[in-house]
Amino acid sequence: MSIASQKKVKPSFVCLRCKQRKIKCDKLWPTCSKCKASSSICSYEVEPGRINKSPTIENAPHRDIRNITPASMSASGSFTSILNPSTKDWEMKNFAMNLSNAHDKLVVMNNTTIVDSPFAFHSILQHDLYAKALTTCIHERILIDVERHRENVSANNKKRELNLTIGDIGPLFFIDKAALKFIENTSKTSKLYPPIDFLYNTYDYEQAHPEENNDKISINILLEELSKYFLNKNEVDGLIVDFYKTIYPVYPLLEISLFEDNIRELLQLNEFNGYNIVFAGKDSRRKLETITLLTIILAFSYRRLSLSTSHSFKESFGVKSNNLTLLAHKLLALMNVFQYVNEHTLCCLLYFFILRYLNPDQADMYPTHSDILNLKFLENVAIKLGLNEEPFQYTRYVSESDDYPRLFNLRRKLWLGVQFLKFGILIPEGDSDILSLEYLRSFMKTDESLPELFERNYASTNNLDLSLMATAENIYHLHLSLQVLLTSCFPINGPSYLKEVLDNIDKTKDFLNQKFPLILSSLGEPRMKSLHINVPSSLANEESFDFSTFEENETFIANVISYTCTMNIYDSLSLHFENQCFKNALEYKTYYHRFTFTAIQDYLTLLKLISEYFNGSLLHLREPFGFATQKVVRFSIHRLLIFQATLLVRLFYKKDTCDRSSAAMGMLNDRNGRLSRVIEKMIKLMSYHMKLLVEIVISKLEKSYLGSFISVSIFRYIIYLVDTDALSAFISDYWKSDAVMDERYSRIHRIVGLKWGMGRDKSFSFTSKLNNPQFLGSLDLEILEELEKLISAQEFSRNFTEDVDESLQSEIDLMNYDNEALNQLMAIDLDKLLGIFPNLSNF
């Protein structure tokens, strides 16, 4: 552990942004004119006109979150006593740290080998000793139970039935239906989508002679299939307008007026009030791009309507969306998009990526490595197109193209779209790098703000886009701030430094609170006056768009992503100093307490946001924008559940340590009694929080989203272990069992060892560390009492009663359990099951 040396340099009174861009700064405080005009973060090394003082880091945990938690949350200010009495003169050191390592990010599963992102679920579970213990045991227990059952069936030649006592109840009883659903979906989607992603075969549409049906893949065949979706003009127009109002504001990647000009050339109204697709004539490639984009848009709208609880044609809409998605995929392949790279093909690729990513039939609750690889590839396409540069630098467009204003708007939107996707997908994963950061900065190096750039083309820009760009610029700067933060946490080469990380967190939260202050109605604050803007479409018949609700939705999503990110960082800092405390508790315990406390603060903020979104003052956001934003919300729910599970494992092991200590002394002293009581209360509170989230998933998400249905099954099993007081015993007993050393299960041990990096050869040292009272020694009475006060002060925690446990119990009846699903599961080939259960055991 080393302390960074700081060299004194002459202070600069120019703001950091102007200094970086090498432009003149008027040094106005607190925001210079240049930064104010571009809505950028303005910060100074030294406040102009004042004495240079080194910034101090307060001893109290991070200040209370503004405008977000109920009034009761402000009571947490009284809990800062955790650091005040004993550390009045304590000064935080700028430690060099390694918050992530390659070993914990390695994924070896089936035929896949990757190094994952720092905050990917697999990385988080590997990095945390107690999370790794739980997931390894669940994964291996599932596979061994399956193998044992097969052995019994083979030996006795009897019907496949599981006759287990309650004490033998394992995770199989909870995941059987999820596993069957996973298999069914895998079979269905493998038939629905060609397994080619964006690596298309080079197929040149223009050499295929579309007027002849002499090829297996013919544009005429696809157009004939598409024509049945254009029989009703009003329905088609309505679906396009629905897209403009629900998907486009969140992902504004196209130029509406340009798109509708192209549609008018492509679609011809017939005598039956339907559309004919006119593909004859010149510029057939542009028409192919237009029909592809239109097909994707219709698939979006049908998919969103299939999720609407108020519509009676949900199933048929889902089928139509799947069929249109498949047709769009074939059209993209026909376009040979990488041979003919342009703004319109990238627009199609981006919207197709979003359509597949948001598919509710996806089994994953989190971004897969293929999602991340595809997104990074799309960013490379955007860079190849030069979208990271302001379009006005390309002067040949201005002199040679009459329609350059709309093209410039489209180019800006496409770059923003790529970054917004990275904001929603990669930032929560902790994925960042210096090169991406520089490309982000290069786009904003102009003195003009985004609304000002769009106003240059005022005749070609509508009011909706001007309003969207003001919000988009704030999202862009927040994305930039989070990229800076993550890059400081996980440099490619070398350590991260504590003060730099904390300073970047403060800057990010300051910007978040300034630009995205979330005001919940539970605070008694009045909601903003509704603002409606006309949808800029000739198809909309002067329909208006509720821009105020959209702004609320963007504010909500910005807070969810930001607090997911900062919670992960504080949790990583807590884990880092927990390990350091094992070596030197006297030096590092204060740091461990601080970051454990702040991690819980951000956890509670995020939990409050999710709770309000499904059951409170943010409920009105779900209908218009739920489909476009559900992946971010579900990802955060999953991360909260993992946070709860790992804390519960720690509390159970701490409880075991406390019980052993009391038993050894033959009495329960006052301090041990207080410790036992606060641990019991914490277990009940965290278990209650987990049940609240599981109840949200079951009641609000499970029926519509396959990933939610699959993931919640494991957490129901964890709740069962908590309710039966068996969470730590489940882990400890497993490592003591004969199965761990049984050579019959060597294949299973090898699979699990590669998956989690913890094979049976390490079982003794691993269990010794889990049960070592020194390892959790810093999770002491002082911090536990402060955490219990903080958690109990929350409104949703105060609703907790002892009776709620029974009302939220899992619906499984273990005494009268139906073996039908398990029997179906056991009939499946073992190799197929080995490929499924790693995904299920990944929480």
Swiss-Prot record:
GO terms for molecular function: DNA-binding transcription factor activity, RNA polymerase II-specific; sequence-specific DNA binding; zinc ion binding. Keywords: DNA-binding, Metal-binding, Nucleus, Transcription, Transcription regulation, Zinc. It is found in: Nucleus. Residues 15-42 bind DNA. SMART domains: GAL4. It comes from the Eukaryota. GO terms for cellular component: nucleus. Present with 339 molecules/cell in log phase SD medium. Required for growth on non-fermentable carbon sources. This is Uncharacterized transcriptional regulatory protein YLL054C.
